[in-house]
């Protein structure tokens, strides 16, 4: 079993030497890296409810007063995994490309910036 969680990424680490790391925590690590670790691209951040027919990998930032599966998840990153919404709390310094706005936005002091056009 891993002994620690890395605070910035939330990844598990610290397996004992020789211990197999291929368990639920390693699976969680790989999924987390795939969802949030590479070039975060957000389809939209203005929606208050999840889209009706998301495709696996679709990523959003729920807007204020979110409803349904997104209720209480405002400012988090929501990824549809093909069966359910998976959420992650962003950390200071995360940068995301907001597709429908063509802007880069950074997370700081508990909120996403308005962004800069690119």
Which residues make up each language-model segment?
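Short consensus segments that form the blades of beta-propeller domains
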Residues: 68-70
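Short, conserved acidic/polar surface loops in the N-terminal third of protein domains
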Residues: 72-73, 108-109
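Feature captures the catalytic cores and cofactor-binding loops of soluble hydro-lyases/lyases
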Residues: 73-76, 82-91
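Surface-exposed loop/edge segments in extracytoplasmic proteins
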Residues: 85-86, 113-115
